[in-house]
Design a protein with these regions (language model features):
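Aromatic/hydrophobic pocket-lining residues that form π-stacking "cages" and hydrophobic walls in ligand
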Residues: 15, 41, 285
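Tryptophan-rich aromatic "cage" segments
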Residues: 313-326
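Glycine-rich, aromatic-lined ligand/substrate-binding cores of catalytic
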Residues: 81-82, 86-272, 280-288, 292-302, ...
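Rossmann-like NAD(P)H-binding beta-loop-alpha module
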Residues: 37-93
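Structural detector of well-ordered beta-strand residues that form the stable sheet scaffold
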Residues: 25-27, 57, 218
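Beta-strand-loop-alpha-helix segment that lines the small-molecule cofactor/substrate pocket
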Residues: 1-34, 48, 294
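Active-site-proximal cap/loop segments of hydrolase catalytic domains
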Residues: 9-12, 18-20, 38, 66, ...
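Short, solvent-exposed turn/loop segments enriched in Gly/Ser/Thr/Pro and often Arg
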Residues: 5-12, 31-35, 60-62, 222-224, ...
Length: 326
């Protein structure tokens, strides 16, 4: 199943429970989770290369950076009703959401911008870019989330995601590991340039900075690609630890096929719904914070609710049109 796994937090929780109950082999399409780099990152952090990690900054240039839906969020809701392509079952494509007539401003691809169908830049790319820190640091569920954003364009206010946003998560301590503050930036907003980065070096268009008491790591999108300690001298000096995490042999898709062939008692795929569901929940909680904006949301993971914001609670799921249930 592609990332994000679901449209709503409730759906992510339910589909994870269903996969667990029926004991089936599953895989979410965050292919970086099968990479070598993400395993190296987890091993290096376990080795103490950064010391206790307290801060993460992650960003994407989307929805501005060259995407087919990059300029769409400023347009008005389409009013004309062109014919549905012969190759498309529009009713099935809509699934459980409220009916709207077909329009190419929704599909293909541009659906990501619309609240009806998509989850914005954070839902689109968070399961790639936040994956390394979420896994390597065993972050689990946040206890607070808050967001700020650019304004919505007048013609689509409350219908699309904003051009750019910043989301701040706080994750509680995990055993001896300290709390972590994770900040997400999209729409070409960026974190401050690390002072350890040498002159002439720049941050990637999408990626993350992981900050510990003993140093920093920068990586790109999709499974901590192009991971480097900074400054570069630290990268050259670091004595790599032994590789202890099992590697995926072949592709992300091939790993799922391998799991299916092994059957119910086999080794799960690298990003099974047990993991992918939790990662999706984290990303979609940030999406809700963007929609309520400028509110500190306190999250109760076990109860599946925000303890201090009824409006945010309503966004955990959507009404389904007749014929669809979960």
């Amino acid at each position: 199943c592609q990332k994000p796994l679901t449209h709503t937090v409730y759906e992510a929780r339910e589909i994870t429970k269903a996969a667990r109950y029926y004991n089936v082999q599953t895989q979410m399409g965050n292919q970086g989770h099968s990479s070598e780099h993400i395993r190296l990152l987890k091993e290096w952090l376990a080795d103490g290369v950064l010391g206790p990690v307290t801060e993460v900054h992650a960003w994407t240039d989307r929805p501005v950076g060259g995407d087919p839906w990059s300029t769409f969020a400023v347009q008005a809701r389409p009013q004309d009703t062109p014919p549905v392509p012969e190759t498309l079952n529009w009713d099935l494509w809509l699934g459980p959401v409220a009916y709207r007539p077909y329009h190419p401003d929704y599909h293909p691809m541009k659906w990501r911008a619309w609240l009806d169908f998509g989850t914005g830049a954070l839902g689109d790319m968070g399961c790639h870019i936040l994956d390394p820190a979420f896994w390597a640091l065993d972050l689990g569920a946040p206890d607070t989330i808050e967001a700020t954003s650019t304004h919505w364009e007048e013609n689509v206010a409350g219908q699309t995601f904003p051009r750019a946003s910043i989301v701040r998560y706080r994750f509680p301590a995990r055993g001896e590991r300290p709390p972590v503050k994770l900040t997400w930036y999209d729409g070409r907003l960026m974190p401050p340039m690390p002072e350890e980065l040498e002159p002439g070096r720049t941050l990637p268009d999408s990626g993350a900075i992981i900050i510990g008491k003993k140093g920093k790591i920068i990586h790109g999108s999709h499974g901590a690609g192009s991971m480097r300690l900074i400054p570069e001298s630290r990268m050259q000096e670091y004595k790599r630890p032994e590789k202890t995490i099992p590697r995926v042999l072949g592709s992300h898709e091939g790993d799922w096929i391998r799991a299916c062939k092994e059957g119910r008692n086999g080794t799960p795929a690298s990003s099974s719904f047990e993991y992918g569901g939790a990662l999706t929940e984290m990303a979609l909680l940030g999406m809700i914070a963007i929609r309520v904006k400028n509110q500190i949301l306190r999250w109760d993971h076990d109860a599946l609710r925000f303890v201090n914001n009824a409006k945010a609670d309503e966004l955990l799921h959507i009404p389904y049109r007749p014929g669809w249930t979960l």
